[in-house]
Amino acid sequence: MHHFNRAKKAKNNEFFTLIDEIENEVINYQKQFANKTIFCNCNDGKNSHFFQFFQTNFNQLQLKKLIGFSFNNLSQADKFTFDGNKVTKTKLKGNGDFSSDESIEVLKQADIVVTNPPFSLFQSFIDLLIQHNKQFLVLGLNAAVSYNHIFTYFKTNKLWFGYTVNKTMSFSVNSDYQLYNPKTSNFFTKNGKCFQKIAGISWFTNLGKPHYNPFLNTNCFYKNNEKNYPKFDWYDAIYVNKIKNIPMDWNGLMGVPLTFLNCYNPKQFELVDCLANPYATLDTLKTNAFVKLNQGDVRNVNGKRRYVRVIIKKQQI
């Protein structure tokens, strides 16, 4: 399959997702986009790399329509529509926020949402898409899986990871970007442009069918190695420090690293819960009230707080 055409010009006035990152993911779903209306509702209108990518590759993807909103917190924003021939600009009544009535009205007409929503609003953004039964392909922090609703959607197969998972991505930014600091390793310049590197970025989607990994086989066992698998202090599950150490002979609950979801196969393991803060995300074992009463933390093992853990259980095959 040949490469998509590149959008040649882009004003560097937003937190830009790079064209390469968009292309490398979209190429896996090319058939899904035929005769569809695409809505980019969290970007900078026609200046967005998302809008430019789909405009440039409109015919190759056989799109029906492309719509993008700009966002202006201080005044009226704009709506941009591309039908394959020309871009039409329309002034909005509001600021272009994805949760505004104007944006939701367009969302109802769209088939697929492709964008990079604000990370701090990721859960409410996905809630909105699920509520309106929309297909989507969006960027987010890998850690968002630990959020209550996101984990539930993951568990119930309403969303899954795309083909790019837990990657350190570079985003182009303005040199006057609020957090820009050329002295830190997170920022760098190339060909006169400024970029920021952000770790743990994944694509989230409900396009097509989830592509699951082969069954995991670690060659590790709980029997005769019990000391390597202590129990959580406040949660009835064993603690597993690394994915490669998941015991193949353990049929009970176990807490594994969040990155386990990168190699998750629902035919082999069941997602039970997530320990991402002092309390269990879904409170599957109904332990949260007791933990709160005693000022505990479900992540603790031998009194020491551990990192986020996904609670899983082997499927009975």
Curated annotation (Swiss-Prot):
Protein name as it appears in the record: Type II methyltransferase M.MgeORF184P
Superkingdom: Bacteria
EC numbers: 2.1.1.72
Signal peptide: none
InterPro entries xrefs: DNA_methylase_N6_adenine_CS, EcoRI-like_methylase
GO BP annotations listed: methylation
Catalytic activity: a 2'-deoxyadenosine in DNA + S-adenosyl-L-methionine = an N(6)-methyl-2'-deoxyadenosine in DNA + S-adenosyl-L-homocysteine + H(+)
PROSITE patterns xrefs: N6_MTASE (PS00092)
Keyword entries, A-Z: DNA-binding, Methyltransferase, S-adenosyl-L-methionine, Transferase
Family stated for the protein in its record: Belongs to the N(4)/N(6)-methyltransferase family.
GO molecular function, one term: DNA binding
